[in-house]
Amino acid sequence: MFRKITSPPLSAINRVLLVGLYWLSVGLFFSVTAGAEQLKFKKAQSESGVLFSYEWLDMDSTRQSISFELPHTAIKAAPTQQANYRPKIAQRYVTVALMEEAKKINPKEARVKIIPKRDSIDIQVKGANEDKVEAILSNLKAVQREAYNAYLDEHYFTRFTTLFNQKAIKPDHTRYATESVKPLVAASQAFYEKVNAQSDSRAYFSLILSWLQSIPYDTLEDRVVSNGSGYAPPINVLMQNVGDCDSKAVLASSMVRAFLPSTKMIMVFLPNHALLGIALTPMVDDRTIVHDGETYVLYDPTGPALIPFGQVSEDTERYIVTGRYQVEAVD
């Protein structure tokens, strides 16, 4: 009995990845003329942590400033691995797992060959007992799936279905956001303490949005070809003082979650952009979307356009109106 299977081609996964990550490649499409301006950024090391200091102009052109210290322990606890999906490395990871499993098989029962190819992995099983061959092949297929899932998890990737219903791989943005909440509590607290005690949550959002939008925007020459390597986890955005739309969206999600630990939140993905939604009571002029029966007020931390809380750009509005967006819940 001879059975052979060919794994899903990793090069094909990579080709879809390029499509799946297309929304990460953002052009500055905002029609708003007012731009955020960071006036000062300073980062200083201390025995206990890293002190961050900022000055910027808010939406009213008022000079704002803030400082906060992130303890070394918090920085160490936060995910800092930057995503860069490489199909060949993923293939090698899976191949090693398959070969280790194949070593456990008694050669008297079956002969197994694991053959990595350019864009696939062939699994060949030969043996006299058909049922045994089928069982071995089934087990190896399970090992293959588990190994690939382990690779994705270890490197902070997740599966993603594009608006074109294509399967893809992307950084696990919501996981980055969730695992960065506790490390960023001190940063979120600094903004909370700066807002007037009598103000509502919108004052917090206005302040933190103007700060996020003033952080320099990272325009990559060819983000698609980079396989997602332009993405920076929240701590990295702070350390490097630069970030693109998805990087800033995840940073914002982490800090807002620390401020509102139980309020429902979402990330909204457009073909060329990413923004956020929060389940607060909307005002008359707020741009909202409904997801799973819940109404979310939209906000966009990208910058440098100064877009107020509850408002979106004209391009974003066109995508929302036509339903060309996808939603992921933030835990």
Give the predicted meaning of each segment.
Residues 7-8, 19, 252:
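General helical structural elements
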Residues 1-15:
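N-terminal secretory signal peptides that target proteins for export/translocation
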